[in-house]
Structure formats: C-alpha cells, structure tokens
Regions:
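Glycine-rich beta-strand-to-loop/alpha-helix junction loops that act as flexible
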Residues: 45-49
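Structured mid-to-C-terminal alpha-helical surface segments
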Residues: 1-43, 53-63, 69-299
C-alpha cells in the first residue's frame, strides 16, 4: 500500500501521504458498498466527499462518507415501533455487509449494534454512524435512513486522484491490484442543491462548526448555488432533523452565538485543503453569518 500511496502522490502532485491513504480507503469502501445491487439502488452518496469525488474535484480531502436511504416512502405510515423494527433490520443488513468490506480492506468493524465502539444511533435509529477503525484512527460512515429528500438524484462517476493522469502500461501492470479498487465507478448521488441545504443544516445544528463545511459552501457558491436562493428548502431540511435532541440544543446555542473565528484557524481542517482558498473565500466568510442568522430566525 505504501508504494501505491507514493505513486499516487507523485502522479497527482499532492504530497500528503496520510490523506492520500485515507482517500484510497474511503474510495474502496464506497466502491464495495455500491457493488451490491441492493445498496446501489437504495443509497445516495452525498456530503463533502461527494462534492470532492463527483462534482468539483480534489480542492480538499475528505475523511468520512455520508449516505442517505433513498426510498423514504417505505417508512411512510409505519408506527413508531414498526418503524424502529424495520430500520434496525436494514441497519443490520448494512452493517453485515460493512463488516465484510472492512475485513477485506484491513479495517476493524463488527456488526454489533449494541457496541458504542462501532455504532452511534440518533433519532430513534433514523440516523446511524458506523465506526470503522484503522488502528486508533476512526473512519465514519454516517447514514440518514429517515430524512427529507427535496431534489431528484443524479448518477455520476466517482473519481480518483489519478483522474486525467496518463498511466503507462508498466504502471498499470505493476499496480494492477491497487488500481482494481482505486478506479472510477458510477453512483447515485445528491443534487448540488440538496448538498448545499444539508451543509447549512450541519453548520447550524453542530455544536462545533468545521472549516471544511464553509469551504464546501464556498465551492457551491462559486458554481452558482447560493444560500439565499434555497432558504425555504434549507428550513425544511432543518425542521426534518429537530427530533434529534442534540440538534435542537445546538441550534438554540448557535442562535445565541454564531462564532467562526476559532474554526477558520483550525490546523487539522486547514491540512485537509489541497488548494489554498482564493482571496474571495475570506469575503464569503464575512457575509456568511448574516445569511445563516436570517435562516435561523425563520426556523
């Protein structure tokens, strides 16, 4: 693996081996998830990882995966206990497949729903974080099983750091096994507008904001997707998550004080950046609190 990491670093021109390794791992996990027909048909790829690997290219690294169950209609009309039973059945199916995927990738994960080491539940099992481990390093796969999906999904190719790199025949032969899992493939994904709505929701319902979310919003803004144009949809998204107690508490906390200064200097978050944000990123950050407060005032 270390030799292939060095190869990707050389070919991509990005000298961040630890983050390259993380990209190889999450790419393999995602590919293996979507190699299952059931998962490929029923789960949508989303979030910052989706923006990087499907839409805008590697302006930053991602260190986790976010998915949503697409067929929300299957939960409609179910009572509280029947819904929980059905959710736990699907969570168990996903966890069982993930256990094999993790084993094949040399990661630690056990499909033990009662284990806090491997599972974190929210909202009566409506949202689950599956926690995979590479030694002491955590790789999170967060799945929203119940949520509002407002825009039609798309089918897009998941790219790698070797996109647009011409590989020689010798390179292809030498790294044949690694290139077999680190190659492009197609997935169903969230529309950019849906991702923007959830990015704003994440910022407003987290106890601590993350600089990567601001950079993602900036990239969406530069591509023509603006918070002001999607206020109604963002509010719908926020209201859909308010049955999570901690999100309600965080929203109230952020309503009283929305402070970005400490976030923008976080060295870990800065290390995720592949390219330094342009100067207008700072101007974007200065305008952002006003737009966010306007939304909070309407929730």
């Amino acid at each position: 693996m270390s030799e292939f990491i060095a190869f990707v670093a050389e070919k991509s021109g990005i000298k961040k081996p630890n983050l390259i390794e993380k990209d190889l791992i999450i790419h393999r996990i995602l590919r293996d998830i979507y190699s299952s027909r059931h998962f490929a048909e029923n789960y949508l790829f989303k979030g910052g990882s989706c923006l990087v690997k499907c839409y805008f290219g590697y302006y930053r690294f991602s260190v986790d995966l976010d998915l949503t169950w697409q067929a929300q209609e299957v939960w409609a009309g179910l009572g509280k206990y029947e819904l929980r039973r059905c959710l736990l059945e699907e969570i168990g199916n996903f966890g069982s497949s993930l256990e094999k995927i993790a084993q094949d990738a040399g990661l630690e994960f056990k499909n033990e729903l009662k284990s806090k080491k491997y599972f974190e539940f929210g909202g009566g099992s409506r949202m689950v974080t599956f926690k995979l481990w590479k030694d002491s390093e955590l790789i999170k796969i967060q799945v929203n099983f119940v949520d509002e999906i407002l825009f039609p999904d798309k089918t897009i190719t998941v790219k790698t750091l070797l996109e647009n790199v011409q590989l020689s025949r010798d390179d292809t032969a030498y790294f044949e096994e690694a290139l077999e899992f680190y190659r492009p493939f197609k997935v169903k994904v969230y529309d950019e507008k849906e991702i923007l709505c959830e990015k704003v929701r994440a910022i407003l319902t987290r106890r601590t904001q993350k600089l990567r979310d601001f950079y993602d919003l900036f990239m969406l803004y530069k591509s023509g997707y603006k918070i002001e144009a999607l206020k109604e949809q963002i509010i719908v998204k926020i209201k859909a998550c308010l049955h999570y107690r901690r999100y309600r508490a965080n929203l109230e906390r952020n309503r009283k004080s929305l402070e970005f200064s400490a976030v923008t200097e976080d060295p870990f978050e800065r290390e995720l950046f592949v390219t330094k944000p342009p100067k207008d990123f700072d101007a974007f950050l200065e305008r952002l609190p006003g737009a966010l407060r306007e939304i909070m005032n309407q929730v």
